[in-house]
UniProtKB/Swiss-Prot annotation:
Its main location: cytoplasm. The lineage of its organism: Bacteria, Bacillati, Actinomycetota, Actinomycetes, Kitasatosporales. This is Putative pre-16S rRNA nuclease. SMART domains: YqgFc (SM00732). Belongs to the YqgF nuclease family.
Length: 167
């Protein structure tokens, strides 16, 4: 018979609550969300990314609307795990986002190969390249969120690295 005490021994615990994922790109920012149980990640929208203050405003609105327990942001790394100019740009973007949505925590998670995987998935499902541009960032955000959820499900700890708000 399963009791709360026995359930603890069954493995790591995952926090309950909706999360948002953000895939930051130069032109577009993909956003995804999950259900409160962290089972299914779904696309939310693509936010225009060239006007960074406007993008931050829209992301703050989405955080207010979805009320997530945290926001995970994909951190682009090289295949060897290093960070280049794109990662530095995402770190700056994420720092500003974290300030704007505090006290909601923001975490950076490895996003290696998510856009490639999303692109392959869209092509396999018959999405044409022109239409795909408008949803590729959302699809990448879904993959980022699914990976973050799986990481927490396995480890029982929040995924990636926390972003400290520097004022």
């Amino acid at each position: 018979m399963s009791t709360p005490e026995n359930d603890q021994a069954d493995g790591p615990r995952m926090r309950r609550g909706r999360r948002l994922a953000v895939d930051v790109g130069d032109a577009r920012i993909g956003v995804a969300s999950c259900d409160p149980d962290g089972i299914l990640a779904t696309p939310v929208e693509t936010v225009p990314g060239r006007d960074v203050p406007a993008a931050h405003r829209r992301l703050r609105q989405l955080v207010a609307e979805y009320e997530p327990i945290e926001v995970v942001v994909g951190l682009p790394r090289s295949l060897k795990g290093g960070e280049g100019p794109a990662a530095a740009k995402v770190r700056r973007f994420t720092q500003e986002l974290a300030k704007g949505i505090a006290p909601v925590p923001v975490r950076l998670v490895d996003e290696r190969m998510t856009t490639v995987t999303a692109s392959q998935g869209l092509r396999a499902s018959g999405v044409k390249s022109k239409k795909g541009r408008s949803v590729i960032d959302q699809a990448a955000a879904v993959i980022i969120l699914q990976q973050a959820l799986e990481s927490e499900r396995v480890s029982g700890r929040p995924p990636g690295e926390g972003v400290e708000v520097v004022i």
